[in-house]
């Protein structure tokens, strides 16, 4: 019985059980033999479900009340068995197609006086449950459950744990369940009370799965007020070409409108005018502070371990906070609770292995996933001792387990550990990495109230080592969080669903510690540690006002408290320190309190067209400080101080959505303002000049643009075209005469074309082409000499442009011979297929033949790069 426990007791039950199945549906034609002693009604029903094609639908409280049942029948019609089973019990049964509906007889109610019948509140019941994969037992996130009765249609989507709840009037309903990568399923029910209906969906694909962008094309997505959201999950559309055969989720989302790549060799990205640090990246609710490997060439996310990714560009739900621009919410696989299995891949620079299986079938499961590069193994082949003793690799390990504690409780434990190591023997080295751990407890109070409680740990640190003679030192930096979260989802009635919750985070930031060797010409220094509490409470309601109008509104209230121990400063606009105040351990330095209201609106013009609008305010209390134009593992996170204030953004978005089956068209426009934006003084050195506030300047920003997406989801040819037209500016006191200037991430045009074609059952071809306007950069305006040394001087911040960027990637996947429990494939790809020499950086020097002239030197990272990888699953 799909809404109850699977019968573990059947393994030891002292009963005999036999049946003769029939394809015919009438209960008279299905005959069973059944012998049970002192069993509960739930156990009897589950035994009948095991040996017949029928499923029972009933209120949980009705079933659990019936116990101590004994029954002994041999080769009797099911209809006769049902009559015998329920004779003398206060339960009625009704056959509805392949379902047997159980209910208590209706109680006689006294006549209603006072209000006429037309004004009385109609009786409502709740249909609730979970949606899971039939093959693995994992929850299905974002599945759509549509209940239809005559001309009335009501829908809902499962939450991030696969739970759903629908409030409906009594009656007969057709329930249609759909999800990406799953077969559509229909159930027929007769609703006469609160009913639990757990659903198992069959996967559409049995071979290897890839990541691709997918969105629902049904009416549910049109009716939802949520804007600027994209969901990625395992699906039937095959792979996008990748660099060196390594699948990269963060690179994939950068092919969507409004999400801009930070460039080659950089896993950072910009969303609607925000900086790379303004994106909240979560792995099972834990923040990942540096989502990159190998200096940004690859992301920290091993696709074998990832189940679902949701990206919010605007109108972020109130449970998310702490960043201005976007949320990337990554959920790990839960592990197969039915069978053991493994998958993995072997590429040119890395290999992966993923193992999963049940700890106790149907109740608990585990997942272990690992990945490592082996570029350092090739370095050992060199005859140069400096090279063959060098190290260059990264590794990561994902682990997860979940336990079903009961009908209403489930516990999840998950963790991630990743590390990068780059070193040149006897010269220098750097290593960095993330560690996260999450413990989550799901509890179902009742059919309408769902709870998730989480305890989360996150740590990021780096260490730089220099072994140069006379200048030996180590630099260590760290940011560490402990976070407690609680979220309640209350499905109040057919028109309202409410989310309320809180989170409390303790931040510890160790900006840097420099330790010298015995003979080094450098003093040991420890920058002051910073401590803070970041708390928030929130409440939102999604209201289905009419069949055409939906509204989500709410507020998040954030409080950021700066704690001692440490010194805090008064600083003049010139950067000079005017005074110093010392605070003891735990002493409150300052508290920033910020309300963050939000509202989103959807109006469905017809069955295929909708208009949406949203407004959201976000606050950011942690800031990334960097001296380089590209992301670096040595970039430093700093928290608010008495000088560094919370960044605040206000964003308004308007969108048009059209289902042009088999195409989908989305057009969104936005305008965003940002306060307390950070830039740097000319000649700033963020590593040695302390306090850091003396190196910073503050101001405001604005961004606006138009995003266009046309996507085809079905057929042999699938893909999308995205285009973004945008402008991003900053106005910082002390820069460019206090006038508006281009932010580094300002790009006028950004285009991506993605296509996948299933040539045959075995071959799949794919390609993507990207183009974007070059970044705004600062180039020298002149030069001068001092004692024979050449120095460049700069007059206008971000007054020039890098060359325009464009690139074509192509790929092909060959599905190899499949066996019953084993599948494999070969993936071939070419990155930058026509060898475009895109600029990574441009430096300047005197021309060798004419010192009066200055020449620009362009550095290119990638030209044409072919790759091959082998992937398997069993």
Language-model-detected regions and their locations in the chain:
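Gram-negative outer-membrane beta-barrel transporters
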Residues: 671-673, 692-781
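Surface-exposed extracellular loop regions of Gram-negative outer-membrane beta-barrel proteins
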Residues: 461-462, 508-519, 561-575, 603-651, ...
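Short, acidic, small-residue-rich periplasmic hinge/interaction motif at the N-terminus
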Residues: 45, 51-52, 89, 95-150, ...
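Signature of Gram-negative outer-membrane beta-barrel scaffolds
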Residues: 504-606, 735-738
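Outer membrane beta-barrel strand-and-loop segments of large Gram-negative receptors
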Residues: 481-487, 526, 534-536, 639-645, ...
């Amino acid at each position: 019985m799909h809404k109850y426990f699977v019968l573990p007791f059947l393994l030891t039950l002292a009963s005999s059980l036999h049946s003769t199945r029939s394809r015919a549906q009438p209960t008279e034609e299905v005959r069973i033999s059944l012998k049970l002693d002192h069993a509960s009604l739930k156990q009897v029903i589950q035994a009948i479900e095991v040996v017949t094609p029928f499923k029972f639908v009933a209120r949980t409280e009705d079933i659990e009340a019936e116990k101590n049942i004994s029954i002994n029948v041999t080769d009797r019609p099911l209809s006769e068995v049902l009559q015998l089973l329920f004779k003398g019990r206060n339960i009625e049964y009704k056959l509805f197609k392949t379902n047997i509906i159980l209910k208590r007889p209706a109680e006689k109610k006294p006549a209603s006086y006072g209000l006429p019948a037309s004004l009385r509140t109609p009786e409502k019941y709740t249909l609730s449950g979970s949606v899971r994969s039939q093959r693995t037992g994992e929850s299905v996130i974002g599945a759509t459950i549509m209940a239809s009765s005559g001309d009335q249609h009501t829908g809902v989507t499962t939450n991030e744990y696969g739970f759903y709840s629908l409030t409906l009037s009594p009656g007969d309903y057709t329930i249609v369940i759909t999800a990406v990568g799953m077969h559509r399923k229909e159930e027929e029910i007769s609703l006469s009370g609160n009913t639990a209906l757990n659903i198992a969906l069959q996967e559409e694909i049995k071979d290897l799965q890839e990541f691709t962008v997918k969105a629902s094309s049904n009416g549910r997505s049109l009716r939802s007020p949520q804007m600027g959201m994209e969901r990625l999950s395992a699906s039937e559309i095959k792979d996008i070409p990748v660099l060196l055969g390594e699948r990269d989720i963060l690179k994939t989302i950068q092919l969507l409108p409004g999400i801009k790549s930070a460039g080659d060799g950089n896993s950072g990205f910009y969303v609607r005018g925000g900086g790379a640090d303004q994106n909240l990246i979560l792995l099972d609710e834990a923040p990942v502070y540096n989502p990159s490997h190998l200096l940004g060439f690859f992301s920290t996310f091993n696709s074998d371990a990832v189940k679902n990714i949701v990206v919010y560009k605007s109108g972020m739900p109130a449970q998310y906070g702490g960043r201005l621009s976007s949320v990337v919410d990554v959920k790990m696989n839960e592990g197969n609770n039915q069978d053991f299995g493994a998958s993995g891949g072997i590429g040119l620079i890395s290999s992966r292995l993923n193992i999963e299986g049940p700890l106790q079938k149907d109740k608990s499961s585990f997942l272990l996933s690992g990945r490592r590069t082996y570029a350092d193994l090739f370095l050992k082949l060199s005859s140069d001792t400096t090279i063959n003793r060098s190290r260059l690799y990264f590794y990561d390990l994902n682990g997860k387990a979940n336990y079903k504690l009961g009908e209403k409780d489930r516990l999840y434990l998950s963790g991630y550990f990743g590390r990068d190591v780059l070193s040149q023997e006897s010269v220098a080295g750097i290593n960095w990495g993330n560690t996260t751990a999450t413990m989550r407890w799901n509890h179902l109070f009742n059919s309408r109230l769902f709870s998730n409680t989480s305890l989360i740990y996150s740590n990021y640190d780096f260490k730089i080592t220099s072994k140069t003679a006379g200048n030996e030192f180590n630099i260590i930096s760290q940011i560490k969080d402990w976070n407690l979260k609680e979220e309640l989802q209350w499905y109040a009635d057919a028109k309202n669903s409410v989310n309320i919750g809180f989170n409390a985070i303790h931040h510890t930031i160790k900006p840097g510690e420099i330790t010298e060797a015995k003979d080094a010409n450098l003093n040991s220094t420890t920058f002051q540690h910073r401590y803070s509490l970041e708390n928030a409470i929130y409440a939102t309601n999604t209201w289905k006002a009419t069949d055409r109008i939906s509204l989500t509104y709410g507020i998040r209230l954030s409080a950021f408290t700066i704690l001692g121990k440490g010194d805090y400063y008064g600083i003049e606009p010139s950067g000079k320190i005017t005074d110093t105040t010392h605070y003891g351990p735990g002493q409150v330095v300052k508290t920033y309190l910020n309300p963050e209201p939000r509202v989103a609106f959807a109006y469905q013009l017809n069955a295929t067209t909708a208009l949406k609008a949203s407004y959201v305010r976000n606050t950011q209390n942690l800031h990334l400080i960097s001296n380089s134009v590209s992301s670096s593992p040595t970039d430093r996170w700093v928290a608010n101080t008495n000088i560094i204030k919370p960044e605040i953004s206000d964003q308004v978005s308007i969108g048009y959505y059209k289902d042009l089956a088999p195409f989908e068209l989305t057009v969104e426009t936005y305008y965003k303002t940002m306060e307390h934006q950070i830039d740097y003084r000319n000649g700033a050195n963020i590593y040695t000049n302390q306090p850091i506030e003396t190196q910073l300047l503050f101001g405001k920003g604005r961004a606006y643009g138009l995003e266009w997406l046309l996507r085809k989801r079905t057929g042999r040819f699938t893909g999308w075209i995205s285009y973004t037209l945008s402008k991003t500016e900053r106005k910082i006191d002390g820069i460019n005469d206090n006038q508006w200037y281009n932010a580094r991430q300002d790009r006028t045009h950004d285009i991506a074309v993605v296509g996948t074609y299933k040539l045959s059952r075995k071959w799949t071809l794919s390609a993507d082409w990207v183009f974007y306007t070059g970044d705004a950069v600062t180039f020298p305006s002149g030069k001068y000499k001092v004692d024979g040394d050449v120095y460049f001087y700069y007059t206008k911040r971000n007054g020039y442009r890098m060359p325009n960027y464009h690139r074509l990637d192509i790929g092909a996947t060959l599905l190899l011979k499949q066996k019953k429990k084993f599948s494999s494939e070969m993936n071939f790809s070419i990155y930058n297929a026509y060898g475009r020499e895109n600029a990574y950086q441009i430096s300047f020097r005197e021309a060798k033949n004419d010192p009066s002239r200055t020449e620009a030197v362009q550095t290119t990272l990638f030209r044409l790069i072919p790759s091959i990888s082998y992937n398997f699953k069993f």
